[in-house]
Amino acid sequence: MALPSPASEEAEGPCQEANQEYQEPVCSPVPEPEPEPEPEPEPDPEPVPVPPPEPQPEPEPQPLPDPAPLPELGFEAEPVQEPEPTPTVETRGTARGFQPPEGGFGWIVVFAATWCNGSIFGIHNSVGILYSMLLEEEKEKNRQVEFQAAWVGALAMGMIFFCSPIVSIFTDRLGCRITATTGAAVAFIGLHTSSFTSSLSLRYFTYGILFGCGCSFAFQPSLVILGHYFQRRLGLANGVVSAGSSIFSMSFPFLIKMLGDKIKLAQTFQVLSTFMFVLTLLSLTYRPLLPSSQDTPSKRGAHTLRQRFLVQFRKYFNMRVFRQRTYRIWAFGIAAAALGYFVPYVHLMKYVEDKFKEIKETWVLLVCIGATSGLGRLVSGHISDSIPGLKKIYLQVLSFLLLGLMSMMIPLCRDFGGLIVVCLFLGLCDGFFITIMAPIAFELVGPMQASQAIGYLLGMMALPMIAGPPIAGLLRNCFGDYHVAFYFAGVPPIIGAVILFFVPLMHQRMFKKEQRDSSKDKMLSHDPDPNGELLPGSPTPEEPI
């Protein structure tokens, strides 16, 4: 409104001159034709410049286009909105946009996984028969060979657990098919070469190391690949694999005993190696539907080979799970129990042959262990689902207590029927202990770190599991019988059960302490009022004065 005022003053000047010139001719009518000053009102068009000041206020609204770039700044946020990376992530292995076929070719994969589990653990659970055959060969060279011969089967079983963290890395990097096929081929080579040597030290390497490591690399991918083909029916697929492998492995004690009676140990190794050869072919069916994970995000952030190595090392060897005190105690308790866990599998057959010489069907005991172990795996899964939180550990406590007591009961059995009852409980405890291991790991460290927690746990179990059978064999050499050896085998599981008993109590105590600390933090986390603290009893801060 103030801007047009200078223009109005400029307009008044010419108007006054025009009025003065016009008043003079009013007295004389002659100058009427002098309208020529009227053209001078043409300066009136000069008011036409008056609008130019009006555009001057218009430039002020023109800053309004300047805010218009602000949406452009907001528009630059669209790169965050880029959904292009998400399709690449979904196609690269995350299960978000992936729907398994829930059958079809997946049932062939289930059969391959069943063959894998059944053949591997059928041979390892029948190691007691192989141990007796090995002693018969070595007795001619050395009368006190129980300690040395026990290392063969113990090494093979221990390597399955010892290689677990490494196998998970290879499975993630190379995929299930390559890892499983390579592992089955190594297991075949280990078993087949064991038939060409009679040296105990060489069989430490061929059977204990090669066969054991190959079984570890072939076994874990058989469990991972099921998630590529099943999601809604994954429980059914796992149940078929567990039940099928249990039935499959129950036939191995009878088969190995029959082969041992008709042919020698070397030819028995050759026959068993054919199962690994078939497993090598079946592992080729592990066609991954979810590609193996790649490290492109890591490569973007790591420019040197050393940085990439550190990124991968921290990714695969994450030691944060050991910061959980309850996990450390739980892992230590299970590792302690593993010292006596594998002793009955190795020495039971030889003990029965020495004590019950009239019994020829000693392999029935291993069949009983395999049958109830499969039953325990099926039943314990349903029972653990109904038990909330870390109270599942009490199932492991009970299974370890029974396992220790049953191991101590073996020398006290006076007849073969009592041994059958003991073996039935041994297999049941084995099934309960193994099945609920993963759910407990999820409760302790969460789903993001559960796989690493299980891998570290299996690795910790390897050393005591390897050492247990040789120590029992050494005790047999020292005392002349297996009584002390089986008493020794029962002590570590009982100690492990006592340790595990305190894990839920400690976890609950730590949880309550965290709740108290968090409640204190919430009480102290209110923003202070400008005038000071809250008035006692007032729900709101004191208003500023």
Swiss-Prot record:
Highest taxon of the lineage = Eukaryota
Q: What GO cellular component entries does it have?
A: apical plasma membrane; plasma membrane
**Positions of modified residues (N-acetylalanine):** 2
What does the record say about its membrane topology? Multi-pass membrane protein
Q: Transferase: present as a keyword of the record? A: no
Composition skew (Pro residues), residue ranges: 46-70
Q: Which residues lie on this side of the membrane: Extracellular?
A: 124-149, 199-206, 257-264, 350-362, 414-415, 475-483
Q: What is the consequence of disrupting this locus? A: Deficient mice display abnormal thyroid hormone metabolism with no apparent neurological phenotype.
| Protein name (Swiss-Prot/TrEMBL) | Monocarboxylate transporter 8
> Which gene name belongs to this protein?
Slc16a2
